[in-house]
């Protein structure tokens, strides 16, 4: 449980429990949607823990794909989501619902999308997307780029990048789990691969990977990940909305917490993060 003892953590939480009792009048179960991405899972489960333990409300987590998430929040079927990648990755989704949702602000900044290769591939062979055109490189990669799920903004941008660079490659659209399997298997035998990826992600703490250059900017620039809620959420759940608006995590801390979650569990990683950052948690919960 980190440097704090169980007693110490209890004291931190107890300090906010009086607020939790006062906030109980909001009362309703809060529905928070998320897609099965590592960063989204951690911040969503962190929010659930803080809401249930300190604000006196139950939280129902709704797991689905990205498009249904935006639709659900815009219709009011889902109260909030904590994984709006802006300004580029989720631009198409966000434009469709912008007038029907409330943006509560960024949860973390400095995120990025890109294509990765393992460090054991020499940079003289692959340092840029342009290098994928080399016949010998394409042969070693079998003309394939390992992708993630079909609804992801990264998938759309990767499809556009293949066209912009004139690559004779197939994008294997699947899931984050399939991408991670490719990365893991290749690293065991030092096999060649290129995969679509993003930061923050725990795998950068486990494997030696690097992004390759994108000179045409096809995959976008720096991103911020925002919490987005349905219209009227701030009025119906002012305390929860205030918490989500205050939550802000440095990206290096988030990646470390995500790695902890892979080594233990998301629940244990959430508990550890709360124990290790009592002052920040107290600030988030202050009204």
What positions do the PLM features span?
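Ligand-binding cleft/hinge of the Venus flytrap
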Residues: 47-56, 131, 136-171, 275
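Immediate post-signal peptide segment of exported/extracytoplasmic ligand-binding proteins
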Residues: 22-32, 134-142, 280-287
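A ligand-binding cleft/hinge motif common to bilobed small-molecule-binding domains
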Residues: 82-97, 185-210
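A bilobed periplasmic-binding-protein/Venus flytrap-type ligand-binding module shared by bacterial periplasmic
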Residues: 113-123, 223-236
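Short, well-ordered beta-strand elements
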Residues: 26-39, 57-62, 142-146, 244
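An extracytoplasmic/periplasmic, membrane-proximal ligand-sensing/linker region
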Residues: 41, 154-155, 160-190, 222-224, ...
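Short helix-initiation/N-cap motifs at beta->coil->alpha
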Residues: 37-38, 60-72, 171-182
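A conserved helix-loop-strand patch within extracytoplasmic ligand-binding domains
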Residues: 99-147
């Amino acid at each position: 449980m980190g440097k704090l003892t169980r007693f110490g953590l209890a004291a931190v939480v107890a300090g906010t429990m009086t607020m939790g009792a006062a906030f109980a009048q909001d009362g309703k179960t809060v529905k928070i949607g998320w897609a099965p991405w590592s960063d989204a899972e951690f911040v969503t489960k962190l929010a659930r823990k803080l809401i249930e333990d300190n604000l006196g409300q139950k939280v129902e987590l709704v797991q689905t794909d990205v498009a249904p998430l935006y639709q659900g929040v815009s219709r009011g079927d889902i109260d909030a989501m904590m994984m709006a990648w802006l300004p580029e990755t989720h631009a198409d989704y966000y434009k469709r619902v912008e007038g029907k949702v409330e943006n509560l602000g960024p949860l973390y900044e400095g995120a990025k999308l890109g294509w990765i290769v393992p460090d054991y591939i020499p940079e003289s062979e692959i340092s840029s997307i342009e290098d994928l055109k080399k016949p010998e490189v394409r042969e070693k990669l079998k003309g394939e780029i390992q992708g993630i799920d079909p609804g992801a903004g990264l998938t759309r941008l990767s499809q556009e990048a293949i066209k912009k660079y004139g690559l004779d490659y197939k994008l294997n659209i699947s899931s984050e789990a399939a991408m991670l399997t490719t990365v893991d298997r290749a690293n065991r035998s030092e096999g060649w691969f290129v995969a679509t990826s993003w930061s923050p992600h725990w795998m950068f703490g486990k494997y030696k990977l690097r992004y390759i250059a994108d000179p045409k900017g096809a995959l976008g620039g720096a991103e911020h990940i925002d919490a987005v809620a349905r219209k009227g959420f701030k009025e119906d759940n002012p305390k929860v909305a205030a918490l989500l608006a205050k939550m802000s995590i440095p990206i290096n801390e988030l990646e470390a917490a995500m790695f902890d979650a892979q080594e233990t569990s998301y629940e244990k990683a959430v508990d550890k993060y709360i124990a290790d950052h009592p002052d920040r948690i107290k600030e988030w919960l202050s009204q």
